[in-house]
């Protein structure tokens, strides 16, 4: 009887640790959203995502916009085109950068201007290889342009 109890505890521990592994958050670095002006109805949000295991970014939502989508910018002949994509693969332990002119989050039908030095709450939805979806809340600052990396400020350079 004692062996059955020990085995049950071991099985429960394995199941719980597997569930905890599935809930490990995707690392979000350098997130920001581009500030807008009165009347502007869309903007982009950018960040670097690193997943501890292969997953896919499948959706984004935010209270500041009526529509939020995952987009990519891509050359089509000599023309740069932007389009919504169904999802973005995040390979295990490889940073995927969402940046201007590339993959990004498009926030459309803005409910109010995004002011510099404010922040935007985003809910990122990921789906793993087993089809399990997890949601992750992030807050990103609003800036007028891409923030400079620490130690790489160029504002004072004269060219």
Task: Report the location of each language-model feature.
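Bacterial N-terminal signal peptides that target proteins for export
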Residues: 1-9
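Short, composition-biased local secondary-structure segments
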Residues: 10-11, 23-25
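Hydrophobic core
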Residues: 12-17
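Sec/Tat signal peptide C-region and signal peptidase I cleavage site
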Residues: 18-22
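Compact, glycine-rich, soluble single-domain proteins
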Residues: 24-159
